[in-house]
């Protein structure tokens, strides 16, 4: 079974609905955001939508960090992290694999046409935004898999049978993260060496 990421696998309507809900996040009461977004993911199908939800919220977070943006980026990051406790370990791992697959396939240097073709990225994202997006997802994944709540909470509660069923998922996740790490180290370094500027 291939684990490469392809936009065509998910209907356009799901991307549009998730983008609409993500844009509305700051206007939803904080105590309702998790429930609303979880319900959206379940309605769309967690397997098909959770990774898109995380990636879309990450885009909003990165764009909101610009100096000219008045939106607080923590609205999106807080929702991303709080959603972790709302889904099963298998759903989280499978969604992480899809995020790593997606990021491994998008370029660090994108033209306006590239951005228009992508169903997740903002068409107004700058080159710095795209690089910061990669960095932010790396940071999110690190926070996720080093989280005390995830390790000593969700992972600690799985049964032996569930753990056996997760072995392949663990292997796939590690493989994808290693592949993505290679992308992180190779592409941006070569890009910045041509620009004579430091990476980050």
Short names for language-model regions:
Residues 1-200:
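Structural marker for long, regular alpha helices in very large eukaryotic proteins
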